[in-house]
C-alpha cells in the first residue's frame, strides 16, 4: 500500500536533488555519504523529537529504510 505524504513529490525530489548535489560537489564516496546522512538523521531525531518518542521514530525510520532497499544484484 503506498504511503500518503503531506509533501508533494516535487518538494521531496527537489530537496533530494539538492542534498545529492552537495555530496557530489564534495566528491563524497558512498561510505562517507552514508555516514553523513546517518549523522544528519541522528541529529534531526535528537534535536527535533521528544526524548520519549526518539526510539520509536528511529525504529520506524529503520524499517522504512530497510523496506525501500532494492535487492537486485546490480549496483
Curated annotation (Swiss-Prot):
<protein>
    <recommendedName>
        <fullName>UPF0352 protein YejL</fullName>
    </recommendedName>
</protein>
<dbReference type="InterPro" id="IPR009857">
    <property type="entry name" value="UPF0352"/>
</dbReference>
<dbReference type="Pfam" id="PF07208">
    <property type="entry name" value="DUF1414"/>
</dbReference>
<comment type="similarity">
    <text>Belongs to the UPF0352 family.</text>
</comment>
<dbReference type="InterPro" id="IPR023202">
    <property type="entry name" value="YejL_sf"/>
</dbReference>
Amino acid at each position: 500500500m503506498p504511503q500518503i505524504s503531506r509533501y508533494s513529490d516535487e518538494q521531496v525530489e527537489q530537496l533530494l536533488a539538492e542534498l545529492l548535489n552537495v555530496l557530489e560537489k564534495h566528491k563524497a564516496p558512498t561510505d562517507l555519504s552514508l555516514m553523513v546522512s546517518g549523522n544528519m538523521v541522528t541529529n534531526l531525531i535528537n534535536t527535533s523529537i521528544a526524548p520519549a518518542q526518539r526510539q520509536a521514530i528511529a525504529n520506524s525510520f529503520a524499517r522504512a529504510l530497510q523496506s525501500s532497499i532494492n535487492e537486485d544484484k546490480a549496483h
